[in-house]
Structure formats: structure tokens, C-alpha cells
Amino acid sequence: MKTMTGRLVAAALVCGGAFSGAAVSAGPDDPLVINGEIEIVTRAPTPAHLADRFDEIRSGWTFRTDDTQALEMDDFENSGMVFVEEARAVWDRPEGTEGKACADCHGAVDDGMYGLRAVYPKYVESAGKVRTVEQMINACRTSRMGAPEWDYIGPDMTAMVALIASVSRGMPVSVAIDGPAQSTWEKGREIYYTRYGQLDLSCASCHEQYFDHYIRADHLSQGQINGFPSYRLKNARLNAVHDRFRGCIRDTRGVPFAVGSPEFVALELYVASRGNGLSVEGPSVRN
């Protein structure tokens, strides 16, 4: 039977690198203050349901190099904000057979969407299920605007989610995991700890058991999603949560669930809950 370290070594070798067993840290004590005014909580007490897993929870920002961290501290340096500004124009633009814009129902985005990113995914009574921000956007487009759905992880959708996240930066993540959301949360937890692919790895393998170690050149974080959508220097674009989930499962040589699927919605709720208490940070900058 393979040991866990053996699995991670195998994963590194697939990518042409090697696993370093030494725990490291890239400026974890540096404060994140955006534009000199938006204070972001990047380290927080561990949520009760993770009390036996971590001493504290940490934003992915604390695992990045000083240079990468600095890019997120100024909106003029954060390339993700280019897409936020594009989405602001779309917010006010009428579309569809109804000729309506987002602003017609929700008003100014800074007011109408304030606080929303902090509590999603959430159980939506009218839908009878847990919904993501992306699903709510597409529901508005089809039912209220008479416009076609956006690609779930396409550039239009991801830019709009980044805009919605940006107006809540600094607010604490606070997704509900009890009541009608509990069964979805439990499904997400099951997926998180399930091993996938030929490398037989789970989300927890990298982001819980071996976080703060290196695998090849990647400094493993706790896998928090409070900073999504995230502008990655690696691919020079905004990246959506489900796109990242899909990539992680592919890295195990497994077959990922579909974006927007019940499985990924459940996983998103669970992973978001692991960051309860951190600040909404999107669009973040990562490697």
C-alpha cells in the first residue's frame, strides 16, 4: 500500500518535480490592507467543525511570496480588477428580450450586492436547494432579463462574480451549514475526503495534511476559496472556483465532476465553510 508521502511524491513526479518535506512560510504575518483602507483578515480562529484539523485557518495570500502578495494590496497592480471594471459596465447594460440590466432590479452594485459573496453558497428557498452565485446570476438572466445563460466558468460570468465579490471585500465569510443546507454540506464534506484518480489523493491530502509544504514549486495552502475568483499569474486570467476544483481532480489523474454540478456545488459549500471567519478577498492574486 502506498504511503501518503509516496502518493504526493508520485504527484510531483508526474509534473516533473519533487516534494519537499520541509514546512515553509511566505510572509504569513504580513497584514493585507487593500488600497491602504480595506483590511482583510487572512488568519482566523478555526471553525468549530475543523477544531481537530487546524490551529488556525489561513488565506491563500499568506502562502504566497512577498511580490505576489504586494500585487493584491493595490487595485492598480491587481490584474483581476481589470475584469471587475469590465463587469461594472455590464451591470448597467440592458440585455435580453426584457431589455433589463442588473441595475434595474438590484440598483448600484456596491449597495445591492454588498455582503452577498460572504454568505454564498446558500440554501435558496425559492429554488429548494443550495445555489451558488453563478447559478443565481444565470437564474436572473433567464427569468428576469430574457437573456441566455452565461458559461458557468466563462469570462463574462467569472468577471461578474469578481465584481460581486469585490464589493464585499473585508466582510467575514459566513456560510450557513445547518438547517436545509446541512445535507448538501455533508455531501461536500464526503467529497472533500474522498480519494480520486490514479494518484489516490483527496482534497485533504494536499490542503489539510500537507499544507504549508512544497510540491514541486507550489507552496501548498489550506485550499481556502475566500479569495475567488482568483487572478492566477500562471495562466494570466481570472479563475472560478469550479474551474479550480476541476483542475485539482484532473491533477490526481481522475475524472472531475461537471462545473455547476450538484457535487461541485456541495463541495463549494463545504470548502467555503472551512473559511468561515476569513475575509472575502476576491479577486485575489495567486501564482
UniProtKB/Swiss-Prot annotation:
It catalyses: L-cysteinyl-[SoxY protein] + thiosulfate + 2 Fe(III)-[cytochrome c] = S-sulfosulfanyl-L-cysteinyl-[SoxY protein] + 2 Fe(II)-[cytochrome c] + 2 H(+); S-sulfanyl-L-cysteinyl-[SoxY protein] + thiosulfate + 2 Fe(III)-[cytochrome c] = S-(2-sulfodisulfanyl)-L-cysteinyl-[SoxY protein] + 2 Fe(II)-[cytochrome c] + 2 H(+). The keyword Transport applies. This is L-cysteine S-thiosulfotransferase subunit SoxA. Coiled coil: none annotated. Keywords: Electron transport, Heme, Iron, Metal-binding, Periplasm, Signal, Transferase, Transport. The keyword Secreted does not apply. The active site is at 248 (cysteine persulfide intermediate). It comes from the Bacteria. The lineage of its organism: Bacteria, Pseudomonadati, Pseudomonadota, Alphaproteobacteria, Rhodobacterales. Disruption phenotype: Unable to grow photoautotrophically on or oxidize either thiosulfate or sulfide. Thiosulfate:cytochrome c oxidoreductase activity is zero in periplasmic extracts prepared from cells grown on thiosulfate plus malate. Residues 1-26 form the signal peptide. GO terms for molecular function: electron transfer activity; heme binding; metal ion binding; oxidoreductase activity; oxidoreductase activity, acting on a sulfur group of donors, cytochrome as acceptor; protein heterodimerization activity; sulfurtransferase activity; thiosulfate-cyanide sulfurtransferase activity. Induction: By thiosulfate. Residues 74-168 form the Cytochrome c domain. Heme c 2 binds at residues 203, 206-207, 248. Belongs to the SoxA family. C-type diheme cytochrome, which is part of the SoxAX cytochrome complex involved in sulfur oxidation. The SoxAX complex catalyzes the formation of a heterodisulfide bond between the conserved cysteine residue on a sulfur carrier SoxYZ complex subunit SoxY and thiosulfate or other inorganic sulfur substrates. This leads to the liberation of two electrons, which may be transferred from the SoxAX complex to another cytochrome c and which then may be used for reductive CO(2) fixation. Heterodimer of SoxA and SoxX.
